A protein has these predicted regions:
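Start-transfer (signal-anchor) and selected internal transmembrane alpha helices
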Residues: 1-20, 110
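Residue-level signature of transmembrane alpha-helical entry/exit and packing/kink sites
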Residues: 6-14, 68, 72, 89-90
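Generic structural signal for small/hydrophobic residues in well-ordered secondary structure
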Residues: 16, 33-34, 74, 93, ...
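Acyl-group handoff/entry surfaces in thioester-processing enzymes
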Residues: 18-19, 26, 91
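Alpha-helical transmembrane segments of polytopic integral membrane proteins
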Residues: 23, 101-105
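Extracytosolic (periplasmic/ER-lumenal) interhelical loops and adjacent juxtamembrane/interface segments
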Residues: 25-83
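Loop-to-helix entry region of an early transmembrane alpha helix in multi-pass inner-membrane enzymes
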Residues: 69, 83-102
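Transmembrane-helix signature of polytopic, membrane-embedded enzymes
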Residues: 104-117
Length: 117
């Protein structure tokens, strides 16, 4: 039992830190360019537009000034899960941050091979 807890303790600590640090965003609304990329972006609100997310004309059609299909795909998925509720989008971002934190820990652990980071 003690060995098992020793192995998962860093993951629990990193998860708790990520959640604590980013949880203050949960009650915030959309900001900055979210009105263009999410709130007023009709292309993320219909399955008929799914293929357009990956087209090179997306940034012209959407009003965005950049072509970021993976980011836009997350907006598309978020919209169908949460609707236009910013809290859901923030929750997804916390989950993605947490996943990246844990992946970075695993990568560093593999690179160093010590497991004592």
């Amino acid at each position: 039992m003690a060995i098992h807890l020793k192995n998962i303790t860093p993951y629990i600590i990193l998860s708790a830190i990520s959640i604590i640090v980013f949880s203050n965003s949960m009650n915030n609304g959309f900001v900055y360019d979210d009105s263009v990329t999410i709130v007023n972006n009709s292309l993320i609100k219909s399955w008929n537009n799914f293929h357009k997310i990956f087209s090179f004309n997306y940034f012209i059609l959407s009003g965005e000034l950049s072509y970021r299909p993976v980011v836009t795909l997350t907006y598309f998925i978020d919209y169908f899960i949460w609707g236009i509720k910013s809290t859901g989008f923030h929750l997804t971002n916390i989950f993605l941050q947490l996943a990246n934190t844990l992946l970075l820990y695993v990568l560093i652990k593999q690179i160093t091979k010590s497991g004592k980071i």
